Amino acid sequence: MSLNAEQTATILAEFGRSEGDTGSTEVQVALLTAQINHLQGHFKEHKHDHHSRRGLLRMVNTRRKLLAYLKRTENVRYQELIKKLGLRR
C-alpha cells in the first residue's frame, strides 16, 4: 500500500531542494500527500478496513503538523507547496 520506488523518485525530484533531499518539509509533505491519495482509493473498495484507517489518520495529522510548521517558519514556501499539491482549495 505504499509508493513504489519510481513514484518516490519522481516526488523527490519535483519537490526536493537538491538531489538526494529526502528530509525537507516540502518533500515529506509531498510524500505523505501521495500516500494519502493512494489510500483514499483503497478505502473506496475496503470500507471496513479500520486498521489502515488509523494509519491514514496518523499520516493526515503528521502532514497537518508539517504544514503548520512550514507556514509558521517560511510562508512563501508554504504557499507554493499547497498550490503545487492542490491542497486547501
From Swiss-Prot:
Provenance organism: Shewanella sediminis (strain HAW-EB3)
GO molecular function: rRNA binding; structural constituent of ribosome
Subunit structure: Part of the 30S ribosomal subunit. Forms a bridge to the 50S subunit in the 70S ribosome, contacting the 23S rRNA.
Descriptive protein name: Small ribosomal subunit protein uS15
Biological process, per Gene Ontology: translation
Gene name of the record: rpsO
Signal sequence bounds: none
Cited function: One of the primary rRNA binding proteins, it binds directly to 16S rRNA where it helps nucleate assembly of the platform of the 30S subunit by binding and bridging several RNA helices of the 16S rRNA. Forms an intersubunit bridge (bridge B4) with the 23S rRNA of the 50S subunit in the ribosome.
PANTHER family per record: RIBOSOMAL PROTEIN S15, BACTERIAL AND ORGANELLAR, SMALL RIBOSOMAL SUBUNIT PROTEIN US15M
Pfam family, one: Ribosomal_S15
